[in-house]
């Protein structure tokens, strides 16, 4: 199996130049629900997304997860699907959004078709998984269980996972549109998320200049007595007005940022809602 770091640069498409069909499988204690869909769906590759080996979990739980990961990868290879293992904190909604969305964006940029199995993980994890699918317009699907490895069937868990799938019924979920901020606003939210602290007006102008946003090619002159601050004047006012009009007012109205004032100066901070948008953007 291949180990994938979600921060790796995009990998080249298939050697034959054809688009691939790629599945994302956030995995808990399941086998059948991860493998049986390939009796219905064609795929060249699948990402098996699991907790990292050094996760802060009981060693017995980690060993159990390694078992399921190994069995699923073996099952995928048996049906001609190449598994790639990616790691994620499956108990952190923001990290699930970040990892799943970045993989979706990576594969879509290569022109590949992406499908997401939202039923092979825990209930809490399935929420951000489905949200990421809808934001990026890819198909999420649910694999129905015929029975569960409990009671008299508990002995089947090691070979089937918690859910026993016999009929292999797969139900696609129908997407509804989730409105996202425009591309430049998403970049700004991601920068706020990365910094983990506020951005001053100078930080904002520098960021817009660095990213090549329209109208920010020339910045105001710096004050002589205060390093890093820009002199007040027509150019400074023009760029601050542009920043407010194009980005800050919209993000504030949506509840994605907040401003903290200190006298006549302010700093911009990302809100909890803004963190969700940054993570689901696929840009982190």
Give the ranges of each region predicted by the language model:
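Long, low-complexity, Lys/Arg-enriched
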Residues: 1-113, 127-284
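Short glycine-rich phosphate-binding loop at a beta-alpha junction
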Residues: 113-119
């Amino acid at each position: 199996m291949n180990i994938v770091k979600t921060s790796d640069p995009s990998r080249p498409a298939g050697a034959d130049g054809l688009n691939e069909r790629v599945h994302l499988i956030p995995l808990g204690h399941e086998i059948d629900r991860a493998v049986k869909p390939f009796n219905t769906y064609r795929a060249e590759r699948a990402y098996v997304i699991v907790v990292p080996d050094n996760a802060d979990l009981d060693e017995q739980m980690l060993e159990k997860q390694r078992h399921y990961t190994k069995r699923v990868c073996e099952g995928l290879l048996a049906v001609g699907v190449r598994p790639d293992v990616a790691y994620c904190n499956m108990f952190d909604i923001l990290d699930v959004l970040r990892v799943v969305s970045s993989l979706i964006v990576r594969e879509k940029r290569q022109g590949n078709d992406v499908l997401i199995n939202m039923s092979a993980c825990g209930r809490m994890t399935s929420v951000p998984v489905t949200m990421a699918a809808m934001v990026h317009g890819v198909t999420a699907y649910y694999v129905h269980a015929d029975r569960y490895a409990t009671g008299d069937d508990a002995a089947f868990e090691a070979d089937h996972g918690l859910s026993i799938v016999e009929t292999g019924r797969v139900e696609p979920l129908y997407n509804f549109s989730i409105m996202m901020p425009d591309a430049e606003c998403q970049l700004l939210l991601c920068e706020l998320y990365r910094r983990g602290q506020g951005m001053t007006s100078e930080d904002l102008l520098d960021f817009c200049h660095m990213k090549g946003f329209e109208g920010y090619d020339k910045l105001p002159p710096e004050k002589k007595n205060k390093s890093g601050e820009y002199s007040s004047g027509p150019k400074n006012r023009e760029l601050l007005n542009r920043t407010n009009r194009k980005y800050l007012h919209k993000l504030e109205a949506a509840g994605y940022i907040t401003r903290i004032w200190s006298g006549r100066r302010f700093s911009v901070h990302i809100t909890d809602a803004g963190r969700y948008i940054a993570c689901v953007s696929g840009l982190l």
